[in-house]
Design a protein with these regions (language model features):
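Class I S-adenosylmethionine-dependent transferase superfamily signal
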Residues: 129, 156-157, 166, 179
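Conserved beta-strand signature within the Rossmann-like core of class I S-adenosyl-L-methionine
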Residues: 162-170
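S-adenosyl-L-methionine
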Residues: 1-60, 68-75
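Class I S-adenosyl-L-methionine
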Residues: 175-177, 181-229
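A short acidic, Gly/Pro-enriched loop at the edge of an enzyme's catalytic core
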Residues: 119-128, 133
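A short glycine-rich, Lys/Arg-flanked "PGG" loop and its adjoining helix->strand segment in the class I
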Residues: 148-162
Length: 229
């Protein structure tokens, strides 16, 4: 058994309710066309080459949930290649519905833990990264499983271009305190809270944001820039 808190093996559910016929069909037929194969330890990937039309820049979303945010970003920015990482099959299926309905050609998916993909990407290859409403892992003994973690931030700092943006949002008070503390302490990121409550203009909404508001938990929205090399 591993003792490494940042071991990339997934902790949590991979599947929820049984998929409907359309969703299962998209998993069977569309996902294989969009999926990024898991790289080996020594593999290196050119993210620009993953797309049929070379994008102006590449953005990454880690844990895209139901895919509302990722699909909206991809639709609004057709010149950008958007990579989404998600392990939950039902969330992947929801995103595939958006991709199919919007005929998005600039989306690629990694249906595994993002930490298995990131080491294979080259330095300064991402313009933006999004971590929207991640699993808060509220128990203290599980805090090392949180994606926003010093070691993961080291990796993201390597991947982001100078002044590249990392957006993180959460409605969990414990996670908010954690992410603000960890990000503020990291020497290669500069930024902070953009809004506590209302979603910033131009940031697409998600089902998790809507649920947070319904349940009386105002989200905190943060933006961080990669300090120049």
């Amino acid at each position: 058994m591993t003792t490494d808190p940042q071991d990339p093996r997934f902790h949590g559910r991979r599947r929820g309710k049984k998929l409907r016929n359309r969703a299962q069909g998209l998993i069977n037929d569309l996902l294989p066309r969009l999926a990024i194969p898991e790289p080996g330890p020594d593999d290196r990937l050119d993210p620009f080459a993953l797309f049929p039309n070379r994008p102006r820049a590449v953005w990454l979303e880690v844990g895209f949930g139901g895919g509302e945010h990722l699909a909206a970003q991809a639709a609004a920015h057709p010149d950008i290649g958007v990579i989404g990482c998600e392990v939950f099959l039902n969330g992947i299926a929801r995103l595939l519905v958006h991709v199919d309905e919007l005929a998005l050609e600039n989306v690629r998916l990694f249906p595994e833990d993002a930490r298995r993909l990131l080491p294979a990407l080259p330095e300064a290859s991402l313009e933006k990264a999004f971590v929207m409403f991640p699993d808060p892992w509220p128990k203290t003994r599980h805090s090392a499983r949180r994606f926003i973690h010093p070691e993961t931030l080291d990796v993201l700092a390597r991947l982001l271009i100078d002044s590249g943006e990392l957006r993180v949002a959460s409605d969990d008070p414990t996670y908010i305190d954690w992410m603000l503390t960890v990000l503020a302490a990291h020497p290669l990121f500069d930024g902070g809270v953009i809004s506590a409550g209302p979603r910033p203009e131009g940031w697409p909404g998600t089902r998790y944001e809507a649920k947070a508001h319904r349940e009386g938990r105002p989200p905190t929205w943060t933006s961080w820039r990669r300090v120049g090399r």
